[in-house]
Amino acid sequence: EWCTYYGGLFEDWISQIAFDENNSLLMVGQTSSQNNIATIGAHQVNYSGGLYDGLIVCFDEKGVRKWATYYGGSGSDIFAAVQYHQQEFILAGITSSKTNIATPGANQTVHGGGVSDCFLAKFDQQGLRLWSSYFGGADLDGTYPGYPTEIYLGITLDQDGNIFMCGTTASQFGIATEGTHSPLYQGGKCDGFVAKFNNNGSKLWGT
């Protein structure tokens, strides 16, 4: 029924899309364009720097843009996944930025170290950020060592809105919790991980 380009003068990538109950579409990804991206009054109207900023765009059911925003700090920021639940969008990505990512009181307000951390963010249908949190340790999270542009990260939600994030990590601390399948890093260049968060972004467990 419709199709559209979306982007500016430089590279623009879309990673995933999700729909709400009104058939509005939210697409997420990354951009290095400094024009034709964000809408007036959006969460972040200007490009922040680094190789990429995260990109969030919402269209209505006819393909008309409702709102769009950059997301990120002075490092590189990439959205990899998005899910919808009860009038809210949950987004996941990776970042090397030390600022402009997490909200006060979040599960992890400080970048864990290394080249990249994973992060989660929640937005409402109007583009208002509700919360955001880093998730990572002192090494690479969400990417493979030696291949920082290859992203291994996904999320899904259960019926109660709990968030499950899976991916890859080289961090030996800050990921797993006691009493889970594997609370210790098992070795090699990276391990897989899965972590559960409640709908407010608090980590319930990780392994």
Role assignments for model-derived ranges:
Residues E1-T207:
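A sequence-level/structural motif corresponding to short, flexible coil/turn segments enriched
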